């Protein structure tokens, strides 16, 4: 019985994995990165906010915490390495 359950679980896993589409990754740099991000954010209905909109929201107490953090950005994620559309959308 356990063997039958193990085989059924294995077959289900293989069938599920074969239906999953791998995400296509591309490298986006410079103008191509900016244009692609703008198009994706616009299609998703997200307006990119400027830093000025957040200037008054507790920036005095946030500054000490942000200085020591790793400052990876979209260029690190999508220009230096290939990235997926999901990664680009996370920057909208």
Swiss-Prot record:
It holds the Pfam family Insulin. InterPro entries: Bombyxin (IPR017097), Bombyxin_A (IPR030680), Insulin-like (IPR016179), Insulin-like_sf (IPR036438), Insulin_CS (IPR022353), Insulin_family (IPR022352). The keyword Signal applies. PROSITE patterns: INSULIN. GO terms for molecular function: growth factor activity; hormone activity. Disulfide bonds join 29-79, 41-92, 78-83. Its main location: secreted. Keywords: Cleavage on pair of basic residues, Disulfide bond, Hormone, Pyrrolidone carboxylic acid, Secreted, Signal. It is found in: Secreted. Silk worm has two kinds of PTTH: 4K-PTTH and 22K-PTTH; there are many forms of 4K-PTTH. Brain peptide responsible for activation of prothoracic glands to produce ecdysone in insects. PANTHER family: INSULIN-LIKE PEPTIDE 1-RELATED, INSULIN-LIKE PEPTIDE 2-RELATED. Belongs to the insulin family. This is Bombyxin A-5. It comes from Bombyx mori. The gene is BBXA5.
């Amino acid at each position: 019985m356990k063997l039958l359950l193990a085989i059924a679980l294995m077959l289900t896993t293989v069938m599920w994995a074969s239906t999953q589409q791998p995400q296509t990754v591309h490298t986006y740099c410079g103008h191509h990165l900016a244009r692609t991000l703008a198009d994706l954010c616009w299609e998703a209905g997200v307006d990119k906010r400027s830093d000025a909109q957040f200037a008054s929201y507790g920036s005095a107490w946030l500054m000490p915490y942000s200085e020591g953090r790793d400052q990876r950005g979209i260029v690190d994620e999508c220009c230096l390495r290939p990235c997926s559309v999901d990664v680009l959308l996370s920057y909208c």
